[in-house]
C-alpha cells in the first residue's frame, strides 16, 4: 500500500517539475540573489568555475555523481561558506572534493556534533546511518537566525529525507526543489520563495 502511494507521489512530482521548468532559466524569479544563484551557481551559465578533474578521474565519478559534486562545489563557492558538514555514505569523497575546491573551508565529515558556526550542511544518500537523532532537529531548528544552506538528497526516494525536506521547507527562507536534491536557504535578508528546477 505504501509503495503504491510512494510511486504515485514520485510521478506527481516529476510531472509538476516538467510543467514548472521555467525557473531553470530564471523566468519568474524576482529575487536578484536567486536569479544569480540559479544562473551562475546552479546552472553555471558562464562556465566560470573550474573543477579538480584529477580527483574526478581518481575517484571514478560517474556522470550523475560528477554533476552532484560540481553543484555542491559551485554552491559552496558562490555562497562563500566557511564551514561545511557532510553526512552520508559518500560524505568522505565529497569532503575531499570540496577541500580541494575550498582549501580554507573547515570541512567535517560524518561527525557526531554540529559546529555552531556551520553554514553549509550536506545530507547525502544514507545520511540516516551517520546523523544522530538529536542533530536532526538541531540542523533545522538551530538554523533560525543564522545564514545557512542545507542540501538534502533523495527527497522523493527516502522517507526520512522527505520528512526532513518537508519540515525544512516550512522554516526556510528559500527552498529549491530540484527533484533529486532539495536546497534550503536560511537567511533573513533574502526574499521568501519556492522554486522548482531540474538541472
Please provide the spans of the model-predicted regions.
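A short alpha-helical cap/connector motif
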Residues: 1-146, 156-199
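Structural detector of well-ordered beta-strand residues that form the stable sheet scaffold
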Residues: 149-151
